[in-house]
A protein has these predicted regions:
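Short beta-strand-centered segment that lines the nucleotide-binding/catalytic pocket of NTP-utilizing
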Residues: 1-6
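Amphipathic alpha-helical transducer elements in NTP-driven molecular machines
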Residues: 15-18, 31-37, 51-65, 89-92, ...
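Switch II of P-loop NTPase G domains
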Residues: 18-36, 40-66, 76-86, 153-160
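Conserved C-terminal guanine-recognition region of P-loop GTPase G domains, centered on the G4
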Residues: 60-66, 70-197
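Canonical P-loop GTPase G-domain recognition
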Residues: 182-239
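Accessory interdomain/linker segments of ATP-dependent helicases and helicase-like nucleic-acid enzymes
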Residues: 240-247
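Conserved small/polar residues in nucleotide/adenosyl-binding loops
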Residues: 249-254
């Protein structure tokens, strides 16, 4: 594993309106809002049962508000793959299944505790028991749990209290190259994600790494020449804000500051 302990990065959220607003309010300084990105240990098949760094991985992502899964779609003989070949759909499915398995274990343990209390005459947990069974049915069918399926606020509150991994918003980051095999992997990943009601953003990390030393204007010109509209990090930040349901607003502050 390249990553053992979580690495935390704080990035500014891109907002094209800031410069224009700064001129309007005559602010001397702008403080953009930020987003915390956490790079955690990779996941392998069997992580829900402790394989690899599974227990550590699951513990780390339980603390996150949303998940971004980087999926390899490119070929490179110098970079090995744990399964010996590149298959984007398989890799995405492994992650999703491990999250489902972990939640099945969480819910079944909770179900056992509630069953004992119900048998002793405690009827207050009857609704929670019904919700657990409904969630288990969803997970056993291979689907993630969607809170918008539930209209009752109390039901949503109870489900959130389970701290399930499959309730968290998730999207895929497809790390691609310009080969035909990479394009096929990207297409396959898009089809899989569509079926799971999850989004995919396309990035070329190697290309951006190669031009990282260029100044901002040269970097922008190069990306445009390659048909890339914006840097990978910007795409990731924007998608993260979107799936978290965050709103971005700006307000003038004292001492000539403008805070986003």
């Amino acid at each position: 594993f390249c990553t053992i302990e979580p690495n935390i990065g704080v990035v500014e959220v891109p907002d094209s309106r800031l410069n224009a607003l700064q001129e309007i309010v005559n602010a001397k300084k702008v403080i953009p809002t930020t987003l915390n990105l956490v790079d955690i240990a990779g996941l392998v098949k069997g992580a829900s049962k402790g394989e690899g760094l599974g227990n550590s991985f699951l513990s780390n992502i339980r603390e996150m508000n949303a998940l971004a899964h980087v999926v390899r779609c490119f070929d490179d003989d110098n970079i090995t793959h744990v399964d010996g070949e590149i298959n984007s759909t398989r890799d995405a499915e492994v992650i999703n299944l491990e999250l489902i398995f972990a939640d099945l274990e969480t819910l079944n343990k909770r179900k056992e505790k509630i069953e004992k209390k119900l048998r002793s005459g405690d009827k207050d947990l009857a609704n929670e028991f019904t919700l657990i069974e409904d969630c288990l049915k969803t997970l056993e069918s291979g689907d993630f749990i969607k809170l918008d399926k539930y209209s009752n606020k109390e039901d949503i509150k109870i489900i959130k209290s389970f701290q399930l991994l499959t309730v968290k918003p998730i999207f895929f980051i497809a790390n691609v190259s310009d080969t035909e095999h990479s394009k096929k992997n990207l297409n396959d990943l898009n089809e899989y994600a569509k079926g799971m009601n999850q989004d995919v953003i396309e990035v070329q990390i190697k290309l951006e790494e190669e031009i990282a030393s260029l100044d901002e204007q040269d970097k922008k010109d190069f990306l445009e020449l390659e048909g890339i509209k914006e840097p990978a990090l910007n795409k990731i930040i924007k998608k993260g804000y979107e799936i978290l349901g965050c709103l971005l607003y700006t307000s003038p502050s004292p001492r000539d500051l403008m805070r986003s």
